Design a protein with these regions (language model features):
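Metal-dependent catalytic neighborhoods of phosphoester/phosphodiester hydrolases
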Residues: 49-69, 110
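CN hydrolase (nitrilase-like) catalytic-core segments centered on the catalytic cysteine
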Residues: 76-99, 157, 163-222
Length: 222
């Protein structure tokens, strides 16, 4: 899209329902409904919001986190599946673009996955975080570059990256070459204090400036 237009976007900076995928899903659907009442056309949720970001990996050693790993695996999202079907239906109902981060379960592995649903409820993009960050490698498998794409929606050309992928110049460049107009940045909540927020703001401002696109940044709330 090259014509001038006004888009109303929302960053859903909310907390999940820990250890309860259905509870977090209902929170997602309720938030979409609330955003629709306010005229929102695109909404972005935080990194791996469904069922929840693995905060346990920040504070417990892997060998002591077996139960937490199994709980996350059991609640992880199958794509496509009942959870994605429910989100797609709500996106279609409101004519809204929905960008959702999930823990995706596939063939025995959990992935950090970003989903983009268009205004018709179609799943336009499923991409996996290419290289999980530091402690995350004990939780998620590696993705690949096949998801570094920008998709056409009613609000324009939309792309997404997760957290520390914004420090990967080639990942950002891949989206720039596809003429990204709206960038969806997803981050978890932080246990390390204000330095995380400061770094986050620098990197998303940098991407907006360098790419010439708008950035919607959604960060989890602890």
């Amino acid at each position: 899209m090259s014509q001038a237009r006004i888009i109303k976007a929302a960053a859903a900076q909310i907390s999940p329902v820990l250890n309860e995928a259905e509870g977090t899903l209902h929170k997602v659907l309720d938030t979409i409904d609330q955003a629709a009442r306010q005229g929102v056309q695109i909404i972005v949720f935080p990194e791996t919001f469904v069922p929840y970001y693995p905060y346990f990996s920040f504070i417990r050693p892997p060998m002591a986190s077996g139960a937490e790993h199994m709980a996350l695996y059991e609640h992880a999202v199958v794509v496509p599946g009942p959870i994605t079907d429910a989100v797609a239906q709500r996106a279609r109902q409101h004519g809204m673009v929905v960008v959702l981060g999930v823990n995706e379960r596939d063939h025995g592995t959990i992935y950090n996955t970003q989903l983009i649903f268009d205004e018709n409820g179609a799943l336009l993009l499923k991409r996996r975080k290419i290289t999980p960050t530091f402690h995350e490698r004990m939780v998620w498998g590696q993705g690949d570059g096949s998801g570094l794409k920008v998709v056409d929606t009613r609000v324009g050309r939309v792309g997404a990256l997760a957290c520390w992928e914004h420090y990967n110049p080639l990942a950002r460049y891949a989206l720039m070459t596809e003429h990204e107009e709206i960038h969806c940045a997803q981050f978890p909540g932080s246990l390390v204090g204000p330095i995380f927020a400061e770094q986050m703001e620098v990197t998303i401002r940098h991407h907006a400036l360098e790419s010439g696109c708008f950035v919607v940044n959604a960060t989890g709330w602890l």
